[in-house]
A protein has these predicted regions:
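Peripheral (often C-terminal) accessory segments that flank ATP-dependent C-N-forming ligase machineries
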Residues: 4, 124, 318-427
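Short, charged/polar "capping" segments at the starts of alpha-helices
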Residues: 12-15, 35-41, 141, 361
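Short internal beta-strands
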Residues: 27-34
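Conserved N-proximal alpha/beta basic substrate-recognition cap immediately N-terminal to
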Residues: 45-134, 395, 408, 415
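ATP-grasp fold ATP-binding core
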Residues: 122, 145-167, 186-203, 208, ...
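Conserved ATP-binding module of the ATP-grasp superfamily
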Residues: 128-130, 151-153, 168-203, 237-241, ...
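ATP-dependent carboxylate/phosphate-activation module, predominantly the ATP-grasp catalytic core
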Residues: 199-206, 210-269, 281, 293-321
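Conserved metal-phosphate-binding beta-hairpin within the catalytic cores
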Residues: 210, 247, 264-305, 329-336, ...
């Protein structure tokens, strides 16, 4: 089989080649040039495992990716197109339609990419959602500000990673946003709507992650973000951006799982899909939808999930897509059987991303000997310069911790955070 794989993210986060039990399959890998963090030699050696590897500038909007995939189809006939990341779900669905390949369709995937359509659909399904509006003109923002009052929250309709998010707390913030956020992509042309606004919810943020197989929810679990919100301005200097799983005794565990089930029932997920649902939880335990994604959560959520449940969500999704392409009902049944016993985590897990502090990195601990640290990596190199956190998942390393309950887990995370930063030297 000929498999096209698309990802904006670091390819070393995925073990695509080793996930294939049958080496007769060909993988054509399409990457963002700027997500490749290894040396040229390391990347060359990595590339030898694939039929073809191509990397691009301007990855999200580079039409050469579509062009090259069509060329590959002419030469080899593409059997399967997989995307690992929110940024590729529409591109992948359009290519599937063009090439008449099975998989998720654009008319459904749009609800997971366009946040205005997402929230309109949620409201139509009676899912609690903050008030919101598309920003088609500056007047839309002024009207929303006058109706809701500050604070409000402006964000892109389709970006991820808290990029270009902005909290508006007063009229000065409003005027700054009005002067800067309605720029056209092409000089001397009108602004085309790519932003939205919603009421700012003063609440804690949680997320629920898991896997759907054959349109059936197989595994899911809730976690709490370590930061109160994902406003980029607020988290740029925080040391502990990440999340930690709730345990069974937390009074929010069951309500959050039930909320996720309602989302999954009402949103048009493809029959095999990972999911990442972000919610606000107020002090009175009211739950409101922030966003829903038909992909594995970002940061190190997949590694956290693996430490807790012993399964790799991305690997399972890869194998499900491959089985579906081969019409291998037996393999899909085996995966469902494997997941049937995973009702609760074996360990409660959490992670944090090491903040790329402004300055020049000098040194840091390369190994962690805490028994409760399931995975640790420091990726910064001596002499490397950083400008601070540029999006919510930006990092120069990470740690994944485990604990027998929620309290122990959070204590372990705090201890690891302190240890990591006490060993980092920079100037």
């Amino acid at each position: 089989m000929n498999i096209v794989v698309l990802t904006l993210h670091n390819p070393f986060d995925f073990d695509f080649n080793n996930w294939l039990s049958n080496k007769e399959h060909n993988i054509f890998l399409f990457l963002d040039k700027h997500s490749i963090t290894c040396s040229e030699t390391e990347f060359y050696n990595y590339s030898q495992n694939f039929k073809k590897v191509m990397h691009f500038d301007n990855y999200i909007n580079n039409g050469l990716i579509e062009y090259e995939i069509l060329q590959i189809h002419n030469d080899f006939k593409v059997d399967c197109i997989m995307s690992f990341g929110e940024d590729d779900i529409l591109r992948a669905s359009r290519l599937r339609k063009k090439l008449n390949i099975f998989g998720a369709e654009e008319k459904f995937e749009i609800y997971f990419r366009d946040k205005v359509k997402m929230k309109e659909h949620a409201v139509n399904c009676n899912i609690a959602t903050p008030k919101f509006s598309a920003l088609n003109t500056p007047l839309d923002l002024i009207n929303f500000y006058q109706e809701i009052n500050a604070p409000i929250f402006v964000k892109p309709r389709s970006a991820s990673g808290s990029v270009f998010t902005k909290k508006i707390s007063n009229e000065e913030d409003l005027k700054a946003c009005l002067s800067q956020n309605f720029a056209a992509r092409i000089p001397f042309s009108e602004y085309y709507s790519d932003s939205m606004v919603e009421e700012y919810i003063d609440a804690e943020m949680y997320h629920i992650d898991g896997l759907i197989v054959d349109s059936e929810l197989m595994v899911a679990w809730p976690s709490k973000y370590l930061s109160k919100n994902l406003d980029l301005t607020s988290i740029q200097n925080q040391l502990s951006v990440g999340s930690a799983m709730l345990d069974n005794n937390n009074p929010l565990t069951e309500p959050l799982l039930n909320f996720a089930k309602k989302i999954i029932k009402n949103f048009p997920f493809y029959k095999h899909s990972t999911f990442h649902i972000e919610v606000f939880v107020t002090s009175s335990h009211d739950i409101k939808l922030c966003e829903v994604a038909a992909r594995t959560g970002g940061g190190k959520i997949n590694l956290m999930f693996k430490a807790a449940f012993g399964c790799d969500l991305n690997k399972l999704l890869f194998n499900l897509h491959l089985a579906a392409a081969k019409n291998d009902a037996c393999e899909i049944k085996n995966i469902k059987s494997e997941l049937a016993c995973l009702k609760e985590p074996k360990n409660f897990a959490g992670f944090f991303l090491i903040n790329p502090i402004c300055g020049t990195f000098l040194s840091g601990a390369q190994n962690c000997k805490f028994e409760f640290v399931a995975d640790y990596r420091l990726t910064a190199k001596a002499g490397q310069k950083f400008n601070g956190r540029e999006y919510s998942g930006d990092n120069m390393g990470y740690a994944v911790c485990v604990g027998s309950n929620e309290q122990i887990l959070n204590n372990n995370i705090r201890q690891t955070v302190d240890w990591v930063y006490s060993n980092i030297r920079y100037e």
